[in-house]
Design a protein with these regions (language model features):
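Short, surface-exposed acidic-centric catalytic microdomains
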Residues: 40-79
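Polar low-complexity intrinsically disordered regions
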Residues: 1, 65-69, 107
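Divalent-metal-activated hydrolytic enzyme cores
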Residues: 1-31, 37-40, 83-92, 96-101, ...
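Short hydrophobic alpha-helical runs that function as membrane-insertion/retention elements
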Residues: 78-79, 105-109
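Structural motif
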Residues: 31-32, 77
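Short, ordered loop/turn segments at secondary-structure junctions
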Residues: 111-113
Length: 195
């Protein structure tokens, strides 16, 4: 038995995967997954999405049981924070969120003055090889490495999300540009499959 097994649901003798999954879906009412950049200036993006959508809760409250254990939350937004807010790095999280919670919306947000706009695909590949003596040119699809055109990158990322096998066909997919100075979200892509 591992040192931390008591914290893993699947390591418990009484583990029932179907029952655990059902409990997860009731404990946290997540319905919207928001993919955005790890730039600290972009930290307000989930709040902006919650405000824009109107029926979302973020960050919400943690619910404690009688023993003081953290057993649930009131948040409806699941943040996925990755470099440049690029969707390629969030695909597995989309599949897991759907499996555990049954999501309704996926929102991809790219923000103004993002560090991912400060280099090109060739630039980072060449610099990495020069500085670390490693060729990363085959590790990543060039269209997912940087942002040179916000509208094009949002259209690319939302299409990537929509076409991915781990994305439920009935979820809504949105792409927004976020101005970090004004806090304004501008819709670039709307692919609505459910009301």
């Amino acid at each position: 038995m591992g040192k931390f097994d008591r914290y893993a649901f699947s390591a418990q003798p009484s583990f029932d995967e179907a029952a655990t999954r059902k409990a997860f879906s009731k404990a946290i009412p997540l319905k919207t997954l928001v993919i955005y950049c790890y730039d600290p200036r972009a930290a307000e993006i989930p709040n902006a999405v919650a405000k824009l959508f109107g029926d979302e809760v973020f960050p919400g409250d943690i619910i404690l049981d009688g023993s003081g254990n953290r057993v649930a939350s009131t948040t409806t937004i699941f943040p996925v924070i990755v470099a440049g807010g690029r969707a390629v790095d969030a695909l597995r999280s989309i599949t897991v969120a759907q499996h555990l919670f049954g999501i309704q919306n996926i929102v991809v947000v790219h923000h103004s003055h993002c560090g991912a706009t400060s280099f090109t695909a060739d630039g980072i590949i060449n610099a990495y090889e020069h500085e670390h003596r490693v060729d990363i040119s085959k590790l990543y699809d060039r269209s997912n490495i940087c942002i040179s055109d916000y509208e094009a990158s949002l259209k690319h990322d939302t299409a990537l999300v929509r076409s991915h096998g781990g994305t439920p066909k009935n979820v809504n997919v949105f792409g927004y540009f976020y101005d970090i100075d004004t806090g304004t979200l501008t819709e670039v892509v709307r692919d609505v499959r459910r009301a």
